[in-house]
């Protein structure tokens, strides 16, 4: 298989880095002083109370029975996987879907739930009227172990500008962030198409905008969903596995960037079309490599959620602030500059100034000798104030 489900243990390396990065952006200078005072402690207590209240609201949120689950051939396998979270005391799996228009986000929700709950636009003629659409389904299959578990899916509009087409819709992205503010996000599902050959500048701009809005740590709880994965024919010189691996490598490279930011970014291949092949043995929808994609997708989501101790909750302070992002480096940079100036630059400047002064003395002495040889008075050497005025006169000319 091109992308087999990854065990939850492989995500553990990112957990501590995720928490550290989120904490790094949480407190700006003013909040740091508040946290050291009684007022800051009270504010922190109020915020924690708000989080608890939000958790209770999420638990009481209206949900409908997951009727489409019984129509899915993969039902039993999906329930077994979801039961892993239920066994850990989790009552809900919340997934936020992000990506461009026409990559299959809404279709993926319909496929996952087994029912048409989200409107799908075949042709993108205008901007989405709804920025976010939330669907909550509750398991009710007569099994006490898993009944009551909720699956919450948050669909979002395309992140490209509907008018320009080649720029990021930052307004929509900000509205998405505000809509999910305070909502516990277990997994982010970043959707793109498999049947493309490159990551274009718009893709990179969208990825950067997501990082700036939600914080780079959001990618450590992201699963990449590549739709249109039923590729019957791949480009010449490639087979299915090599093409998938190449596409995955491009997307991961665009997200990870240079240096030390290396989120795992597991990948799930998706085929929402009704023409997707079906296994003659199990009845599961399978990809060209034989993988039952819906079961693999649910497994990736559960693995990612299980690897995180707490869900992600958006707050504006997590957004990238160029003036605050590396503020802790400012004292270090200033100290390094002062040390460099005192140890290296200042002695060399003083030495150079002394050489200039000695050269000027030598030139004026030589001029005096020449004028005495001619029987003239010694040259008039202007003082510093007169010399400065002469320089200004020449500069003005």
Swiss-Prot record:
BP GO annotations: protein transport
Superkingdom as given in the UniProt entry: Eukaryota
EC nos: 3.6.5.-
TM region(s), chain numbering: 329-349
Start and end residues of each AIG1-type G domain: 90-321
Bias type Acidic residues, positions: 10-32, 44-63
Region Homodimerization, annotated ranges: 121-124, 193-198
Placement of sequence motif AKR2A-binding sequence (ABS) required for chloroplast outer envelope membrane targeting: 350-358
InterPro entries: G_AIG1 (IPR006703), GIMA/IAN/Toc (IPR045058), P-loop_NTPase (IPR027417)
PANTHER family hit by this protein: GTPASE, IMAP FAMILY MEMBER-RELATED, TRANSLOCASE OF CHLOROPLAST 120, CHLOROPLASTIC-RELATED
Protein name: Translocase of chloroplast 34 homolog, chloroplastic
Source organism of this protein record: Chlamydomonas reinhardtii
């Amino acid at each position: 298989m091109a992308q087999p489900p990854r065990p939850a243990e492989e995500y553990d390396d990112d957990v501590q880095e995720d928490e550290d990065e989120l904490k790094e952006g949480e407190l700006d200078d003013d909040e740091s002083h508040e946290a050291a005072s009684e007022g800051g402690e009270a504010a922190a207590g109020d915020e924690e109370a708000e989080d608890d209240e939000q958790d209770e609201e999420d638990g009481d949120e209206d949900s409908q029975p997951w009727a489409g689950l019984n129509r899915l051939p993969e039902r039993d396998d999906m329930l077994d996987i979801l039961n892993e979270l239920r066994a850990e005391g989790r009552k809900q799996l919340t997934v936020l879907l992000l990506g461009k228009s026409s990559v299959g986000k809404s279709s993926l929700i319909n496929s996952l739930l087994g029912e048409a709950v989200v409107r799908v636009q075949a042709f993108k003629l205008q901007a989405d009227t709804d920025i976010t659409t939330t669907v909550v389904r509750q398991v009710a299959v007569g099994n006490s172990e898993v009944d009551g578990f909720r699956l919450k899916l948050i669909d979002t509009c395309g992140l490209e500008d509907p008018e320009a087409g080649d720029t990021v819709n930052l307004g929509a992205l900000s509205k998405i962030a505000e809509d999910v503010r305070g909502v516990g996000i277990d997994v982010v599902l970043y959707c793109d198409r498999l049947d493309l050959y490159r990551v274009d500048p718009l893709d990179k701009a969208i990825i950067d905008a997501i990082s700036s809005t939600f914080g780079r740590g959001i990618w450590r709880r992201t699963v990449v969903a590549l739709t249109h994965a039923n590729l019957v024919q791949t480009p010449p010189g490639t087979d299915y596995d090599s093409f998938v691996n190449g596409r995955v490598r491009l997307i991961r490279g665009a997200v990870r960037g240079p240096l030390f930011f290396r989120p795992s970014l597991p990948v799930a291949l998706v085929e929402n079309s009704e023409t997707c092949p079906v296994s003659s043995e199990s009845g599961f929808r399978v990809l060209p490599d034989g993988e039952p994609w819906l079961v693999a997708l649910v497994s990736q989501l559960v693995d990612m959620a299980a690897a995180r101790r707490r869900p992600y909750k958006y707050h504006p302070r997590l957004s990238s602030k160029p003036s605050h992002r590396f503020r802790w480096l400012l004292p270090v940079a200033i100290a390094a500059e002062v040390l460099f100036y005192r140890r290296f630059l200042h002695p060399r400047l003083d030495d150079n100034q002394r050489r200039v002064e000695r050269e000027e003395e030598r030139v004026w002495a030589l001029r005096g000798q020449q004028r005495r040889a001619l029987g003239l008075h010694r040259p008039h050497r202007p003082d510093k104030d007169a010399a400065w005025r002469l320089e200004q006169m020449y500069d003005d000319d």
